[in-house]
């Protein structure tokens, strides 16, 4: 089955976990139609205009923690910042290997042509166009079919400026109503919080119909993931796992950031002590660093806090990008398309636990108090997949690496069934490497039917599902066929069937 490749734009600031997320993201470029790789600013990173202009927004980190460092000309932005260029150049070095394992990887020059600088000068400034905002504007207005997914790994000012320039051009024209409807149908925003307040102050008031997907329940890919990791996830966050599966794997692995690696995104950054090894929290504080997360072992997981914005886009068969509530390796939607607002700027709690809490961590905590069904733990599968793709990047021969199994549910993937009915479903699995493949049918409780369904033989390719007698017409049941091979690392793929209950 041919996998749809969602159109996606990444906007990112030079936070070190954005760097890490970008490495993983490009390893999934085979599954995606990447339309933009855009430098963005945020409250945590902005370049200044190079003209001596000073900037200040009350309540930001430069005036918390007892600091009084701004107004200032720039904040935590390296001169000649090029982390996106660096990762794409590393991708170019390994592209010949990657395309051996999946021919859909885009050529490096295609990715390089998508790089732009957005509204990077000042935190939250949407007063003028930038190359990045111009690219986003053109993509929003084009006539290509399907949704356009726009991530915000940093602030949303570049996205806001693109929308504002559309508003300024068309607001008083006869085309305005049609353009607003088109954009509402087309654009899906995928934020890592509102890191410069431009969603709250401009996008939401002026474009309330744009879908705004925020996720909960998914794997915690953020800073401090190891602090509360489940026992089954903890091994994938250790220094030994990171070294073997990430750091020692070629040019992309070499750019990946871990604790105590000797690197710093911006020289002299008092917030970034992650590259220093051999110091205690108290020693780092005496050295002038703002220690907002406890020191971890050298080489351990540092963070990929923006993964939740794109991990549902991957071609693993869950089709989680089709609807926010479908759920996948990035989590499931918090609520409605215009769900809760979450701003990283609102918390004045500077404790390690509070400061390390990403949107994904917050979402996990929110769900513990809710009535929703438990969410599957996808972290091991996601880490295995990441490891396998990094292995591809350094492996020129197809037979020297593992590849994901193929899984297919025969017939339509959306069917009708009546309450009390027994339906037979047939799956087929295979493996390109000749590995053994284990099968598991399971109910993904993201449908509107709240109860459990009975699956007769969950570990066979063919099985029967009994629709419960209390199912009501119009309710949905999501059934997953999961296939995992026994290669190294083991890789998992899925297919999702949606059963719609007939009206009686």
Identify the meaning behind each predicted range:
Residues 490-497:
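Extracellular and select intracellular beta-sandwich modules with Ser/Thr-enriched
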Residues 500-504:
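Extracellular interdomain linker/stem segments of modular secreted and single-pass surface proteins
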Residues 473-479:
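Exposed beta-strand face motif in extracellular beta-rich ectodomains
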Residues 1-451, 474:
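N-terminal acidic, glycine/proline-rich low-complexity segments
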Residues 466-473, 486:
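Short, surface-exposed loop/turn segments at beta-strand-coil junctions that are enriched for proline
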Residues 484-490:
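Short, solvent-exposed loop/turn segments at the edges of extracellular beta-sandwich modules
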Residues 443-466:
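Surface-exposed, flexible coil segments in extracellular/virion-facing regions
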């Amino acid at each position: 089955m041919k996998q749809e490749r969602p159109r996606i734009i990444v906007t990112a600031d030079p936070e070190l976990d954005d760097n890490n997320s970008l490495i993983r993201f490009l390893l999934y470029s085979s599954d995606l139609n990447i339309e933009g790789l855009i430098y963005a600013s945020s409250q945590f990173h902005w370049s200044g205009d190079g003209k001596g202009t000073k900037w200040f927004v009350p309540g930001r980190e430069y005036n918390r923690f007892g600091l009084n460092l701004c107004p200032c000309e720039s904040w935590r932005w390296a001169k000649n910042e090029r982390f996106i260029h660096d990762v794409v150049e590393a991708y170019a070095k390994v592209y010949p290997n990657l395309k051996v394992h999946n021919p859909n990887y885009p050529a490096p020059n295609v990715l390089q042509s998508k790089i732009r600088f957005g509204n990077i000068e000042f935190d939250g400034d949407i007063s003028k166009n930038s190359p990045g905002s111009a690219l986003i504007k053109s993509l929003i207005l084009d006539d290509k079919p399907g949704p356009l997914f726009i991530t915000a790994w940093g602030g949303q000012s570049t996205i806001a400026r693109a929308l504002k320039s559309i508003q300024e051009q068309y607001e008083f024209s006869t085309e305005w109503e049609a353009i607003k409807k088109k954009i509402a149908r087309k654009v899906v925003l995928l934020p890592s919080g509102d890191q410069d307040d431009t969603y709250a102050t401009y996008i939401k008031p002026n474009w309330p119909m744009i879908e705004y997907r925020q996720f909960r329940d998914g794997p915690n890919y953020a800073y401090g993931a190891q602090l509360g990791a489940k026992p089954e996830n903890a091994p994938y966050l250790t220094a030994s796992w990171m070294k073997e599966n990430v750091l020692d794997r070629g040019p992309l692995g070499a750019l990946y950031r871990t604790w105590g690696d000797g690197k710093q995104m911006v020289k002299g950054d008092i917030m970034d002590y992650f590259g220093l090894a051999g110091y205690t929290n108290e020693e780092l504080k005496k050295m002038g660093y703002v220690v907002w997360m406890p020191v971890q072992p050298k080489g351990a997981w540092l963070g990929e806090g923006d993964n939740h914005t794109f991990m549902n886009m991957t071609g693993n068969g869950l089709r989680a990008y089709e609807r926010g509530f479908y759920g996948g390796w990035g989590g499931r939607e918090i609520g409605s398309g215009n769900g809760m607002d979450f701003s990283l700027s609102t918390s004045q709690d500077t404790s390690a636990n509070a400061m390390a809490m990403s949107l994904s961590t917050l979402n996990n905590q929110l769900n513990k108090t809710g009535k929703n069904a438990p969410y599957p733990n996808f972290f091991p599968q996601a880490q295995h997949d990441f490891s396998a793709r990094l292995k591809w990047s350094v492996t020129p021969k197809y037979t020297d690496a593992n590849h994901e199994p193929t899984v297919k549910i025969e017939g339509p993937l959306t069917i009708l069934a009546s309450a009390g009915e027994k339906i037979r479903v047939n799956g087929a699995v295979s493996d390109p490497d000749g590995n053994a493949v284990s099968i598991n049918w399971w109910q993904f409780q993201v449908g509107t039917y709240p109860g459990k369904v009975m699956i007769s033989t969950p570990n066979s390719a063919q099985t029967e599902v009994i629709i419960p007698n209390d199912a009501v017409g119009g309710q949905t049941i999501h059934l997953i066929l999961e296939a995992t091979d026994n290669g190294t690392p083991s890789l998992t793929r899925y297919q999702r069937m949606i059963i719609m209950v007939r009206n009686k």
